[in-house]
Regions:
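Short small-residue beta-strand/loop micro-motif enriched in glycine and branched aliphatics
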Residues: 81, 308-313, 365-368
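Gly/Gly-Pro- and Ser/Thr-rich, intrinsically disordered tail segments characteristic of DNA damage-repair
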Residues: 1-240, 247, 286, 368, ...
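C-terminal hydrophobic structural anchor segments
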Residues: 321, 325-390
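Short, charged/polar surface micro-motifs in flexible loops or helix N-caps
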Residues: 22, 45-48, 305-309, 361-364
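A short glycine-rich, hydrophobically flanked beta-strand micro-motif that places a catalytic Asp/Glu
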Residues: 150-154, 295-299, 354
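Hydrophobic, well-ordered secondary-structure elements that form the walls
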Residues: 300, 356, 393
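DNA-contacting surface of Y-family translesion DNA polymerases
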Residues: 7, 16, 205-348
Length: 421
């Protein structure tokens, strides 16, 4: 797919497929008794749990993503909490992408529940893009599951196609063309546009741009001045059918992070918190091995129930990929900090969340050999370990450090980028 077209394109040949209430729909697909009922997918189903994905029926009752489970149950007493099954969602994702690739080779998954289908090079094959979208909906219901629904937006570029996919939910189909775009924008707020949050909306309003329609007709120079960056010019291009600019066309990760909100059970003992920290480091190891990269920097941060935070960053003298090594580096830093300042443990019962991030990657083949130690055998063993896990299952071969009678860490999956699924 050409992500950097700068020529004018007004034909609606780009489809943005957005699966409706994806996690909950997967659960309803495999469990007939959940169909038609308000469902809330949660990582933990205790009172302090959080609804990460409400079903269509739950959304109609006012349940929102991120709502605490007890609040959701008070709002919707017949809500059915269901524990998340990440491997199941990955399987459905793979099946959906396989269906989309029957219509075009130019398919780019944008997240676990979204994908772009570019039909620009298929205009001799497909005469009616709306008919193609309807055929995609039918194919997903037939080949993936009869309870799986999606909203599809059709437009000349990805930005507008994504915008169109949000206009009508669930099971919607909206086409944006030069003749219809003003009507679509007229019904929206600035924050309804992809990439515009409250902060950017406030900046635009301060510059006299209060609506998406005003954003479309603002001059590129004014937009660049208001936004204080080139992003204003990009919005002008997209809203005026002048091109598609993807700022991250390389497909490479700039960073990877593993983060968890910590339940009362997880913070009950220091050992449980240390186990969670190790699990986060092992998650990053798996992702780096899969992407065939080593990191040169790492950060660790945690937030407490009081709102206080602790942050730590380190630059490595040699690139790292090994999860237990990352864990040891963080753990040693915490011990040094606690001894130097004679304070309570950083990992304590008041923790609310914990995050480990790695960045500044270099390809595996570019990692320089160490003058003081031969790590090549260890690196090859790590690669072999993850190859076997990928082939036979993540629980079929474990390190001693991964063995737990009652694991505190549960696999989860987000709605964002799918590079590290």
């Amino acid at each position: 797919m050409n992500r950097n077209r700068l020529t004018e394109c007004v034909l609606p040949t780009v489809l943005f497929v957005d699966m409706n209430s994806f996690f909950a729909s997967c659960e309803q697909q495999v469990n007939f008794w959940l169909r038609g009922r308000p469902v809330g997918v949660c990582v933990y189903t205790g009172r302090q749990g959080c609804v990460i994905a409400p079903s269509v029926e739950a959304k109609l009752r006012g349940v929102k993503t991120g709502m605490r489970l007890d609040e959701a149950m008070a709002l919707c007493p017949d809500l059915v909490p269901v524990e998340t099954h990440p491997s199941r969602y990955r399987e459905f994702h793979v099946k959906i992408v396989a269906v989309l690739k029957k219509f075009s080779d130019d398919v780019v998954p944008k997240s676990i529940d979204e994908a772009v289908v570019d039909l620009t090079n298929y205009q001799l094959v497909y005469k009616d893009m709306r008919k193609v979208a309807q055929d995609i909906k039918q194919a997903i219901r037939r080949d993936v599951g009869d309870y799986m629904r999606c909203s599809i937006g059709i437009a000349p570029n990805v930005f507008l196609a994504k915008l169109a996919s949000d206009v009508q939910k669930p099971d919607g189909l909206t086409v944006i063309t030069p003749d219809t775009i003003d009507d679509v924008l007229r019904s929206l707020r600035l924050t309804d546009l992809p990439g515009i949050g409250r902060g950017m909306a406030a900046r635009l309003e301060a510059g006299g741009i209060h609506t998406p329609l005003a954003l479309r007709y603002a001059s590129p120079d004014h937009l660049k001045a208001v936004c204080q960056s080139i992003i204003g010019w990009h919005w002008h291009l997209r809203l005026n059918f002048s091109g598609e600019v993807d700022l991250d066309s390389s497909g490479a990760n700039k960073s990877m992070s593993a983060m968890r909100t910590i339940s009362p059970e997880q913070r009950s003992t220091p050992e449980r918190l240390e186990e969670l920290l190790l699990s986060l480091c092992l998650t990053l190891e798996r992702r780096m091995v899969r992407q065939q990269v080593f990191c040169q920097e790492m950060s660790f941060s945690c937030r407490y129930q009081s709102g206080k935070t602790y942050n730590y960053e380190v630059r490595f003298p040699e690139p790292r990929q090994d999860g237990p090594e990352l864990y040891q580096i963080i753990n040693q830093r915490l011990l040094t900090f606690q001894e130097a300042h004679r304070c309570e443990p950083v990992l304590n019962e008041h923790l609310r969340s914990m995050c480990v991030a790695v960045f500044r990657f270099i390809p595996t083949e570019s990692v320089p050999l160490s003058l003081f130690s031969d790590t090549s055998r260890k690196d090859k063993l790590r690669q072999t370990l993850h190859d076997l896990k990928a082939k036979f299952g993540s629980d079929k071969l474990l390190r001693a450090t991964e063995l737990r009678d009652d694991p505190v860490y549960r696999d989860v999956i987000g709605f964002g980028n799918i590079k590290d699924l």
